[in-house]
Amino acid sequence: MNAESGENAGGGCPLGHGAGAPRKRPSNRDWWPEALSLTSLNQHSPRSNPYGGDFDYAAEFNSLDLDAVIADLHKVMTDSQDWWPADFGHYGGLFIRMAWHSAGTYRITDGRGGAGGGQQRFAPLNSWPDNASLDKARRLLWPIKQKYGRKLSWADLFVLTGNVALESMGFKTFGFGGGRADTWEPEELFWGPEGTWLGDERYSGERQLHPGLGAVQMGLIYVNPEGPNGNPDPKAAAVDIRETFARMAMNDYETVALIAGGHTFGKTHGAGDPSFIGPEPEGALIEDQGLGWRSKFQTGIGPDAITSGLEVIWSQTPVKWSNYFFENLFNFEWELTKSPAGAHQWVAKDAPEIIPDPFDPNKKRKPTMLTTDLSLRFDPIYEPISRHFLENPDEFADAFARAWFKLTHRDMGPIARYLGPLVPKEQLIWQDPIPERDHPVIDDADIASLKQKILGLGFSVSDLVSVAWASAATYRGSDKRGGANGARIRFAPQKDWEINNPPLLAQVLQKLGEIQSDFNGSATGGKKVSMADLIVLAGCAAIEKAAQDGGVNVAVPFTPGRMDALEEWTDAQSFEALRPVADGFRNYYHESHFMAPEEALVDKAHLLRLSAPEMTVLVGGMRVLGANAGGSQDGVFTHRVGVLSNDFFVNLLDMKNEWTATEHKNRFQGLDRKTRQPTWTATRVDLIFGSQSELRAQAEVYGMADGNEKFVRDFAKAWDKVMNADRMDIGKPADQFSQKLSA
């Protein structure tokens, strides 16, 4: 046992309060590491933002002189600094890597990662082995950030700098959209189960990568450039490349373009033994001021720099756009060698020395490649794409430009969030486009009339609430995808998901479609109503009825203006990533999920940008409204299904109920303590609100004698937040983790 955990030979406190104990104060997490954490629901509080919760970054960015920023960045590119000299006199390669690694953490499975927020500034990303020396890139940019201040976020600066680096080396980029507001604390994300850098405990079976992760080893962005676990096998490496790039939403064509385009520039660094390298930024000394990986190998910089341990230069013109990557890849045969640092890499066999030295104009080298570069030649799928790009350099340039734009903008959501004069006009399917509104919206009188027609269709409260939730709750605050706007629940794959009860969904959509046709065919003044609006309005009408049936009159907010997406502009395969594997709000959990049900609930709430109170009130409301997937009665602690009441909390907290586990590990049976008769059934998601102390405190608020009306009004407000989470047209999206509920 290491010194931090201590040896507990005497049977005392497991945290070791002795002379040799660490100075770290034990947290609740140290005592109860398996307890459900709500930390993710409390992230990014306005209290951590030095500009305050009302800071409008979009307005600041729109006042920025972007041309001046770009001009200044062009100067930085060739202004080599003695403390970190530029390879070939140009920082382009370094800044491309910085931007790539800022954006490349994106994973399509949950939309997390990516360039938004500027998370590369914080742990653990700032200290990942794959991000070695990018601390220097950020310091090189400090004069730019310092000059433009609040008008230019670090997150936007990282991506913009990558674009300018490409442009300064003769490449034409596809465009740039600003609008990435900075975050001010690390994102608490699951990056893997390992406790050591480059660990690979994330695999099961025959190299089955953990479903929630996007990289092959802890601390890497994608793959090990030496090959799987350092095995220099290009074909095996191709398997890893295909898997990890697909999890970043890239197909084979885009993958080849990205790798080859990025490796047209710059070099890798492996001048000496990695043992000379000091700790990463988070582990460095205080006097190092956030800089890590200090090297004691000779000068430690310039020609003596060690970063990845690989020493590779791909192109004859490493600071100029060319097709040399593919020309060299196919024109030479390759033999395995090792870098000065001992890393596996490849050198062109019997090749002339045609590659420039980064610091000595009188020296030349042979072409070199990474194992993962050779994958583009020797993998049977990548090879024809690579050869096509070799023979069609203009198409390659266009493919790289588009793939780079996708890489650096994939987590930004709808194009409505893109800011600035460099936003391309072309519509791209991966942006999940929704048509702009071209008609007046419905007014209050229309809304009231439509509600009555909807309630007259004969569907239950449960039916209408379930469909509205299914439409809206696909939203992910991580990459701003999903949500009710666009009504893509009408299309594959969402219309066929089992959790959405396809037969009922089809019936509801058909009847709402009839109402839409009647209204749009008779409304005056050009007014129209979208299916997206009608689906949400149906849920709102049902909730108002459910509240009224319980004795509380509440107006559920409704803001019209959603539009309907087109099926031809809906990438079904891409939307499959939004399929719920668990949705605790509907008491749905698939056994394939890698999280416990209650953890999956918190994860879902985090993606919906809900606070703990909002999560609590929504679960309680959805249960009594009968909105469980598949009509399950688990957690439906009420005899008045369809009435919006606080019954879930009242009965959960009632001590007459005793809970026992069943043969199903996630299901429990409630018994009357006196009669031993069955009362309710529940899942782990239901019982966590009585078990976890913070959630029990929330539940008690709504279970009190005076809690019912507060519960109804808080439910309506939290419901409205979910329904509008993706509404980029009515203000800030739901990227805050809390909102003020009723007093």
Curated annotation (Swiss-Prot):
The record marks R97 as: Transition state stabilizer. Its EC number is 1.11.1.21. The active site is at H101. CDD domains: catalase_peroxidase_1, catalase_peroxidase_2. It catalyses: H2O2 + AH2 = A + 2 H2O; 2 H2O2 = O2 + 2 H2O. Its cofactor is heme b. GO terms for cellular component: cytosol. Residues 8-19 have a biased composition (Gly residues). There is a cross-link at W100-Y222 (Tryptophyl-tyrosyl-methioninium (Trp-Tyr) (with M-248)). It comes from the Bacteria. InterPro entries: Catalase_peroxidase, Haem_peroxidase, Haem_peroxidase_sf, Peroxidases_AS, Peroxidases_heam-ligand_BS. Formation of the three residue Trp-Tyr-Met cross-link is important for the catalase, but not the peroxidase activity of the enzyme. Belongs to the peroxidase family. Peroxidase/catalase subfamily. Bifunctional enzyme with both catalase and broad-spectrum peroxidase activity. Homodimer or homotetramer. This is Catalase-peroxidase. It comes from Stutzerimonas stutzeri (strain A1501). The gene is katG.
